[in-house]
Amino acid sequence: MTDAAIAEKDLGNAAYKQKDFEKAHVHYDKAIELDPSNITFYNNKAAVYFEEKKFAECVQFCEKAVEVGRETRADYKLIAKAMSRAGNAFQKQNDLSLAVQWFHRSLSEFRDPELVKKVKELEKQLKAAERLAYINPELAQEEKNKGNEYFKKGDYPTAMRHYNEAVKRDPENAILYSNRAACLTKLMEFQRALDDCDTCIRLDSKFIKGYIRKAACLVAMREWSKAQRAYEDALQVDPSNEEAREGVRNCLRSNDEDPEKAKERSLADPEVQEILRDPGMRMILEQMSNDPGAVREHLKNPEIFQKLMKLRDAGVIQMR
C-alpha cells in the first residue's frame, strides 16, 4: 500500500463521512489506480454505492473485492466484510434468497455472531414467504379429491401423500386436517391424527367432523372417556347429531364392559405413571383417602385438578 494510495483513501473516507459520494468515488478510484491490489479500496467504493442505493454496482465491487482479496490472501475478515455487504445489497432489493447465500459465504470466512442471528431470522422469513407463495386453494381441492379417491380404495399411504400436499396448498382449511386425520387413523398413527383433529377444531370450532373424527381416533385407542368427551363436544355443536349421540352410548357401554381391564390399560399410560410417582400427588391422594372432603381444596389448583381428572378417567380414583 503506497503512501499516495493511502492519502487518496483517507480523502475518500473524509468525503464519505460528509456524504459527498461523488468526491468519495473520485478519491477511491485514484487509490485503486495507485494500488489495485488492496481489497480495502474496493470495499470502500462498494460502501459508497450502497449508500447511494446503487445496489448492482455495490455487488459488482464486492465481487471485485473478494477476487482481489483471494489473489492477495487478504485478511479473511475483509473478505467476509465484502460478502456481507453484497448480502445487504441483495436484502435491500428484497432478494432474500441471494442475500442469505452471500451471508453464508461471509460466515464461512468469519463467524460474526450478529450475522448468524440475522441469517436465522432471514431464513425464517424466506420459509414463510415460500409457504405463502405455495398456497393455492384450487390445487388443494384437487389434491383433496385425489386423496379421497385413494382413501375409498383403501390405499391409505397414497391418500396421505395427496392430503399432505393439500394441507401445504391451503394450511388454513379445517376440512383438510379432518380428512388427513381420518387417513392417519386408518394407518394407526393415532397421535398425529389427534393433532390434526385439534388443528381442525382450532381452525373451525363449528365443524362437527373434527370432533367426531377425534372421538373415532380415541375409540381406536380405546380411550373411552376421552372419546366420550369428544362426542359430547360434537353434540355442543349439533345436539341432534345421531353419530355423536350413538358414539356417547357406545363409549358408556365400553367403559362398563370390563372396568378392571380398562384400569389396567390406563395404569400403563406414562402420564398416569408420572402422576403417581409425584411425591406431592401421592400425599394429596393419601389425604383424600383419609378425608374425602380434602379434594375440594385441591381442585382449586388448575394443575392438580387436571391431574386428578386424569386419574379419575384412568379409574385410579373415584370422584363424584
From Swiss-Prot:
The segment(s) forming the STI1 domain are 269-308
Tell me, according to the record, the phenotype of the null mutant.
Reduced brood size and decreased fertility under heat stress. Decreased thermotolerance and shortening of life span by 68% and 77% at 20 degrees Celsius and 25 degrees Celsius respectively. Growth of gonads is hampered resulting in shortened arms of the gonads, abnormally shaped spermathecae, lower sperm number and endomitotic oocyte development.
What do the Gene Ontology cellular component annotations say? Answer: cytoplasm; protein folding chaperone complex
Give UniProt keywords alphabetically: Cytoplasm, Developmental protein, Repeat, Stress response, TPR repeat
Matching entries from InterPro entries are given as: STI1/HOP_DP (IPR041243), STI1_HS-bd (IPR006636), TPR-like_helical_dom_sf (IPR011990), TPR_rpt (IPR019734)
Q: Which residues form a coiled coil?
A: none
Q: Where are the TPR repeats?
A: 5-38, 40-72, 80-113, 140-173, 175-207, 208-241
Cellular location(s)? Cytoplasm
Induction, per UniProt = Up-regulated by heat stress (at protein level).
Where is this protein chiefly located? cytoplasm
Q: In which tissues is it expressed?
A: Expressed ubiquitously in the whole body. Detected predominantly in the pharyngeal muscles, vulva epithelial cells, striated body-wall muscles, spermathecae and intestinal cell ring. Also observed in the tail regions of hermaphrodite and in the sensory rays and spicules of males.
The domain of life is: Eukaryota
One annotated GO molecular function is: Hsp90 protein binding
- Give the residue ranges for region: Disordered: 241-269
Q: Name one GO biological process term.
A: response to heat
Assembly and interaction partners: Forms a complex with hsp-1/hsp70 and daf-21/hsp90. Interacts with daf-21/hsp90 (via the C-terminal MEEVD pentapeptide).
What this protein is reported to do is described as: Plays a role in gonad development. Up-regulates longevity and thermotolerance. Binds daf-21/hsp90 and inhibits its ATPase activity.
What is the name attached to this protein's record? Answer: Stress-induced-phosphoprotein 1
The gene it comes from is sti-1
